[in-house]
């Protein structure tokens, strides 16, 4: 939340969110600022880095970390997958670990012990170290800017319709 709040306070984007994709061989973390000015890329990066450095230096809010861990532990114990069927979600979890290690198909289902471990590690600066190692010191990063073009879908539809019309005109009655 501190990175999101810093970006919003600086008016970088109208909506800011982060995500972590771990169900692949090379997991990645992303921070997205929707409706941001493309000319503020450097400011975007500077705010993120500055906020993360401050978190590492001053530590994270311990109560917020504990609340987050408790939230996910509760969801895990309750098997709360919102509107998704339990079996489907367990299957996806099994697949995520099995895909890259055929000897550990059930590794992601045996998560309960990790919550106590995370609570202990949080008191020892574990999350700050993760931020330093995997975000601040990581040289494998990129910034991607997507700029919408008004009317692009309609333009593509018109091109496709024209192409299909020309193709249809090239066919005989039997081929149609």
PLM region spans:
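Structured ligand/cofactor/substrate-binding pocket environments in proteins
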Residues: 1
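Core subunits and conserved enzymes of cellular information-processing
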Residues: 131-134, 176
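M16 family metallopeptidases and their MPP-like homologs
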Residues: 4-120, 139-149, 155-157
């Amino acid at each position: 939340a501190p990175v999101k709040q810093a970006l919003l306070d600086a008016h970088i984007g109208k909506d800011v969110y982060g995500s972590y994709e771990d169900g692949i061989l090379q997991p990645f973390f992303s921070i997205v600022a929707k409706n941001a000015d493309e000319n503020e890329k450097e400011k975007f990066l500077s705010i993120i880095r500055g906020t993360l450095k401050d978190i590492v230096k001053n530590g994270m809010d311990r109560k917020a970390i504990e609340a987050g861990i408790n939230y996910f532990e509760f969801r895990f114990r309750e098997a709360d997958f919102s509107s998704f069927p339990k079996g489907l979600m367990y299957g996806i979890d099994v697949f995520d670990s099995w895909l890259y290690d055929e000897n550990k198909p059930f590794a992601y289902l045996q998560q309960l012990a990790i919550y106590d471990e995370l609570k202990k590690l949080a008191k020892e600066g574990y999350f700050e170290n993760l931020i330093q190692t995997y975000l601040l010191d990581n040289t494998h990063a990129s910034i991607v800017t997507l700029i919408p073009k008004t009317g692009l879908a309609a333009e593509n539809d018109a091109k496709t319709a024209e192409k299909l019309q020309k193709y249809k005109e090239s066919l005989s009655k039997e081929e149609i």
